[in-house]
Amino acid sequence: MLIMNGYIIALDQGTTSSRSIIFDSKGNIVSLAQYPFTQIYPKPGWVEHDPMVILESQLLAMSEAFEKSGLSPTDIAGIGITNQRETTIVWDKNTGKPVYNAIVWQCRRTAPICDQLTADGLGPYVKEKTGLLIDAYFSGTKIKWILDNVPGARERAERGELLFGNVDSWLIWNLTGGRAHVSDYSNCSRTMLFDIDNLCWDEELCTRLGIPMSMLPVPVPSSMVYGQVTAGLPGLESLEGIPVCGSAGDQAAALLGQVCIVPGQAKNTYGTGCFTLMNTGSKSVRSVSGLVTSVAWSVNGKTTYALEGSVFNAGSSIQWLRDELGLIGTAHECDILAESVSDNGGVYLVSAFTGLGAPRWDMYARGAIVGLTRGSNKAHIARATLEGIAYQVKDLLDAMQVDAESPISVLRVDGGASVSSFLMQFQADMLRVPIDRPKLVETTAFGAAFLAGLACGVWESVDDIALLRQSDRIFKPEMDAEQAKQYHDNWLRAVGRAEKWSQE
């Protein structure tokens, strides 16, 4: 039930850009601003961002969206945040200056640390406590790397001078002038340091990784007032005092924004990576199929969990065609090329540029194109790139249905690549279930806005969000089932060529 009229500013801090979207109380977009920023690749398999650029671009987007909206400060009820998860920032709590670049979720530099933790037998404990697997994807080993490799960092951390946060924590700390060092449960659950059943940091894991617990943010629910916008933020002077009151990691926010509020409902986000989540309700299911368990959100004392599988490179593989190979000028051209040929010509592309995520969890896999002949052309490669995204999502859904012990009847989709009707149709063909694309594709930002709106009185309960979702198009399977199976069988052969490629 709508309690009051009001507008919510959603900050959507992603892997390649910072965005700000203002929503009204009916879920309509009032204004939007976006600022892309530079990716940093210091070494093969390493990925970084400049934390100050993350902050500055996010504040610029927020300021521009507010200016475009034509609203007054009194119209804004609150601010919600959603963010790229796992990306790790360590900063000086007195100066606010980062001690090193943000180590991005895609970064593989800590694979040797993970290998050692696995060899030490820590895997079962990590899974029991955190719901995760030991992998360089998660924040814990990234923090350890910074403390071990930045001169003086460990000593400063032990003296209580340094703070850690994922991007949500970094933004909230800066928006509130350093008054709130917090992180919501959904983000905490992606660090490999968090006890997801007791909703607290795990002392044993922090000790094993050598991470002082004084660095860690206070774990908090996803919907509550964390603080207010501080004075003096450039371009945001008029928003001083507005409550910052909702936060969730991007995939958790998208699950809510897609109205997957009933156990068994699932969504997939097609962004830089692909992220498939299934609501498991109040039960934190431990996967036997290579998936992980995370907190989805916590509202009014009720915590909701999700099963999750992650594909590390999805939309980024289309960017690779554009930026590194020069085969396309825009993402839409990939669709046009893919549709210009009747099939993939036997070409399969495995986009394991930074390893393979769920369900294989192969940190040493690398990208591969197989099946090339003299007749292969750029259209076949473009088609293979899009099809490769769909195959990986199928692998996730197959694993998820084993863990959930029930079939998925429909998959809700969002994210930038979901605008590709070719990809959505091929996904339906591979999964053999309908694909439901919503009218509002900004589901991640809306999930964050909804959490903020719950805290500041725009909406009353999580059930209210169900009234706001509308479908744009339903894609139903069209391909012959036997043909679909043959395509996927060939894909499995291609993945086998890429696995363990860089392992010495």
Feature-to-residue mapping (PLM):
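N-terminal glycine/serine-rich phosphate-binding loop of ATP-dependent small-molecule kinases
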Residues: 1-100, 128, 234-246, 431-435, ...
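Short beta-strand-loop/turn "lid" adjacent to the catalytic site in phosphate-handling enzymes
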Residues: 67-104, 133-139, 172-195, 220, ...
